[in-house]
Amino acid sequence: MRALSTTAGVALLVVLAGSSLAAAKGSPAKALVKAAKKRDTSGMVAAAEAIADKPDKAGLKALIQIGTAIENMDVYTACQNAIGRVFSDASLRGEFAKQLKGAKRPASRVLCIDGLGTTDNKDAVSLIAPFLADKNKSVRISSIQALLKLQVKESVPPLFERLSTVGFESKDAEAEELFGALFKLSKQSFEVLADWKNWWETSKGTLDPKKLRHSGSDGGTRQRNKNEGKIFESVVRSQAFVLVLDISSSMRVIDLPMGETWYDKKKKKDLKYKDPDPKGTKSPHKNSRFRRAQDAFCKFIEGMSGRARFAIVVFGDKKDTKLWKKDVVPATKSNKKAAVDFVRKLKWSPATRTDLALERAFSVKGADTIYFFSDGIPEKIKGGKTVDIPQDEVIEKARLLNRTRKLRLNCYGMTSSNKTRSFLEKLAKENGGEYKDIRVRKK
């Protein structure tokens, strides 16, 4: 199990001291605390399931406090699912509302709302809806996602009312999340509140989101086409985002147009790319992945609107994996110039520390979306040699880092490797994002 963060560790110590758990000896709540003290993952999962089978106030408190504090996805998921099952006990609804509304930490509110999203009870809508206006964006995103997961028509009105408040013209990721949830629940994409209300009055009696079938011909007022610009022809829809760029030495290669190959005399085989500098000692070729990425990033940065806020992470070896800024900064003229200068001065680096890049990206304050560009699988330098980092570990790390942040992670692959493509596709999917292959160059 990962070590506890400082904040989480303090919260857990409070729990383990028993100051807020008036649970009977031998109860599931006490078992959960005991397992947490021992860092026993399987014990915590089993105790969470036991609380769900026999819910009480102490058990609900333990699920929320320990589920938030322990940095382990198995524990988080077990507590989340148990919370959803606890909600089915009508006698605990009042306590549930009390705990959720009284949760000071955004992470605790996110966990509760994530749990509500797993229940099959439409009464959860009234408890979730007020948190669409929570001061913390991660809580708001979690609320949108939970209302969608419930798959009930009662989720629709609070969502379109919130969208009206955020603004139908907003480019923010929250607006995109609202539009997406509404479309999946209703097959509509209206951009005027009056249209939503009129449609709802005529459709609320027959609408059943679980029975909807989606196709490319689905209607609405019009499809949204708002964005901050394009990078590698990929639309950037967020206005508070982190750009992550792979600067590993494999970025030196030149991708060939579809159908063309280059014979590597050293490897004695045809490749879908050309490597004119195997030792990586020369200046990058103008058509290399490295130069193409630099050009694409700089062009995009220069074209950003003043409403955008952004940050940059670059990664190669450990020493070369770094943040340009710790928080997202406004796309002012001076910030854009500084960012372009930073990107233009980059040099490639050995290894591909995807794990560290994700840590840096998820640490950026104020971001709601990550755009992740890479051409290889996770690697690190060990004993002077490059060795693979298990992909499952990296994917699990991203899920853990994102469990309460709720950032959307979009991945883009400059790769001819099916193994790399599969990894990036899974990384994106596990974090609510999309994958796009950007390797192929036009002739």
Model-inferred region functions:
Residues A23, K197-K279, K326-V328:
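Acidic, polar low-complexity linker/tail segments
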Residues A24-A35, D56-T68, S88-K101, N121-A133, ...:
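Amphipathic alpha-helical scaffolding segments comprising HEAT/armadillo-like alpha-solenoid repeats
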Residues R39-D40, E71-N72, K104-R105, K135-N136, ...:
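Short inter-helical turns and helix N-cap capping residues of alpha-solenoid HEAT/ARM repeat scaffolds
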Residues M44, L60, V75-Y76, R109, ...:
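Residue-level detector of extended alpha-helical repeat arrays and alpha-solenoid scaffolds
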Residues A47, C79, C112, S143, ...:
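Conserved hydrophobic register position within alpha-solenoid helical repeats
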Residues A107, E169, H285-Q294, C298, ...:
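Von Willebrand factor
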Residues Q239, S250-I312, V328-N335, K347:
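…and closely analogous acidic/polar surface helices at protein-protein or active-site interfaces
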Residues D264-K268, R344-L346, G376-N431, K436-I438:
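VWA/integrin I-like adhesion module and closely mimicked acidic/polar interface patches used
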